[in-house]
Amino acid sequence: MRVLGIDPGLANLGLGLVEGDVRRAKHLYHVCLTTESAWLMPRRLQYLHEELTRLLTEYRPDAVAIEDQILRRQADVAFKVGQAFGVVQLACAQAGVPIHAYGPMQVKKSLVGTGRADKEQVIYMVKASLGIRELFNNHAADALALALTHLAHAPMQERSERLAAAGRAARTGDAPLRR
């Protein structure tokens, strides 16, 4: 499975691509897309959309793992991050790539074993899991952490989705015939 992790932000949008499964994850790519604060908002959003669309087309991930947006204390920051989040959703929908959201505590627990882990512990586990010596950007590190989290959770999510679909089909009378 190929997963693109995304740490959404308007000034800095982290991207990290991994492939494999939870036991054998391989690092393929990471980058932090940066927009200039002097750019007008439409230009910033257009740049993020164009770059993300290009990367989705080039790398063709099976899924996107994005940081679930938590309530932020500063309304202006929340608004800007929300706009970047919307651009990510649009680009993924256009590319036909499913999005899975994970909260910060869920990512920390998945990688370190505790939801109270600090940033350095998460970065250490990302580097150790992927065999990376240097990660120069926290946003890209967060994106890789999100991708690894999805690799760990994907098998369980797929099973849950199949069971839910079977339950819906049974309730509506559309259950497949058993032979």
Curated annotation (Swiss-Prot):
EC numbers, comma separated: 3.1.21.10
Residues the entry annotates as binding Mn(2+) 1: 7, 139
SUPFAM superfamilies listed in its UniProt record: Ribonuclease H-like
Main localisation: cytoplasm
Cofactors (names): Mn(2+)
Reactions catalysed according to its record: Endonucleolytic cleavage at a junction such as a reciprocal single-stranded crossover between two homologous DNA duplexes (Holliday junction)
GO cellular component, as recorded: cytoplasm; Holliday junction resolvase complex
EC class name: hydrolase
Compartment(s) of residence: Cytoplasm
A Gene Ontology molecular function term of the record: magnesium ion binding
GO annotation terms (biological process): DNA recombination; DNA repair
Enzyme active site: 7, 67, 139, 142
Residues binding Mn(2+) 2, per UniProt: 67
UniProt cofactor note: In vitro only Mn(2+) supports endonuclease activity; Mg(2+) inhibits binding to HJ DNA. Another study shows Mn(2+) is the preferred cofactor but Mg(2+) does support cleavage. Binds 2 Mn(2+) ion per subunit.
Residue ranges of the motif DNA-binding loop: 68-74
Disruption phenotype annotation: Only heterozygous strains can be obtained, suggesting this gene is essential.
UniProt entry keywords in alphabetical sequence: Cytoplasm, DNA damage, DNA recombination, DNA repair, DNA-binding, Endonuclease, Hydrolase, Magnesium, Metal-binding, Nuclease
PANTHER family documented for this protein: CROSSOVER JUNCTION ENDODEOXYRIBONUCLEASE RUVC
Similarity-based family: Belongs to the RuvC family.
Oligomer and partners: Homodimer which binds Holliday junction (HJ) DNA. The HJ becomes 2-fold symmetrical on binding to RuvC with unstacked arms; it has a different conformation from HJ DNA in complex with RuvA. In the full resolvosome a probable DNA-RuvA(4)-RuvB(12)-RuvC(2) complex forms which resolves the HJ.
Function: The RuvA-RuvB-RuvC complex processes Holliday junction (HJ) DNA during genetic recombination and DNA repair. Endonuclease that resolves HJ intermediates. Cleaves cruciform DNA by making single-stranded nicks across the HJ at symmetrical positions within the homologous arms, probably yielding a 5'-phosphate and a 3'-hydroxyl group; requires a central core of homology in the junction. The consensus cleavage sequence is 5'-(G/C)TC(C/G)-3' (a different site than E.coli); cleavage occurs on the 3'-side of the TC dinucleotide at the point of strand exchange. Binds HJ DNA independently of homologous core or consensus sequence; Mn(2+) is not essential for binding but improves it, while >1.0 mM Mg(2+) inhibit binding. Also binds Y-junction DNA less well. Requires a homologous core to cleave DNA. Another study shows divalent cations (Mn(2+), Mg(2+) and Ca(2+), tested up to 5.0 mM) improve DNA binding considerably over binding in their absence.
Miscellaneous comment: D.radiodurans metalloenzymes exhibit a strong preference for Mn(2+) rather than Mg(2+).
Name used for this protein in its record: Crossover junction endodeoxyribonuclease RuvC
Recorded name of the encoding gene: ruvC
